[in-house]
Amino acid sequence: MATTFSASVSMQATSLATTTRISFQKPVLVSNHGRTNLSFNLSRTRLSISCAAKQETVEKVSEIVKKQLSLKDDQQVVAETKFVDLGADSLDTVEIVMGLEEEFGIQMAEEKAQKIATVEQAAELIEELMQAKK
């Protein structure tokens, strides 16, 4: 966690070899809540921070996607992988969502499920729903 007031903050993830340096003009609180990836989108008037889903959730989702689409074991499926790039159509996506719901013990609202296009989006929604269950 980092707090800064009109200063710079430098963060380095232990698993990554990169360092991110950011300069802020207003008070900002940064916390990664146990996630390994933080990304910062800076514009002149605002800062938005998006966090990738936990790696273990992404890996589980990737395995389920590979299983549902009958992909080979050596087929690479990562967080940024789009279902359509794997050859999935709308019916395949419905089957993926059903598999995810069963595996994680959750129910996805249809309007949210229809917006899922990547492994990471699925993982983030799953984490959101699991957190809401607590």
Curated annotation (Swiss-Prot):
Seed. Signal peptide: none annotated. Pfam families: PP-binding. The modification O-(pantetheine 4'-phosphoryl)serine is found at S90. One of its GO terms (cellular component) is chloroplast. Keywords: Chloroplast, Fatty acid biosynthesis, Fatty acid metabolism, Lipid biosynthesis, Lipid metabolism, Phosphopantetheine, Phosphoprotein, Plastid, Transit peptide. Residues 1-51 form a transit peptide. Disulfide bonds: none annotated. 4'-phosphopantetheine is transferred from CoA to a specific serine of apo-ACP by acpS. This modification is essential for activity because fatty acids are bound in thioester linkage to the sulfhydryl of the prosthetic group. Residues 55-130 form the Carrier domain. Its main location: plastid. GO terms for molecular function: acyl carrier activity; phosphopantetheine binding. Pathway: Lipid metabolism; fatty acid biosynthesis. InterPro entries: ACP (IPR003231), ACP-like_sf (IPR036736), ACP_chloroplastic (IPR044813), PKS_PP-bd (IPR020806), PP-bd_ACP (IPR009081), Ppantetheine_attach_site (IPR006162). Belongs to the acyl carrier protein (ACP) family. Carrier of the growing fatty acid chain in fatty acid biosynthesis. In rape seeds ACP is coded by two multigene families. There are probably a total of 35 genes. This is Acyl carrier protein, chloroplastic.
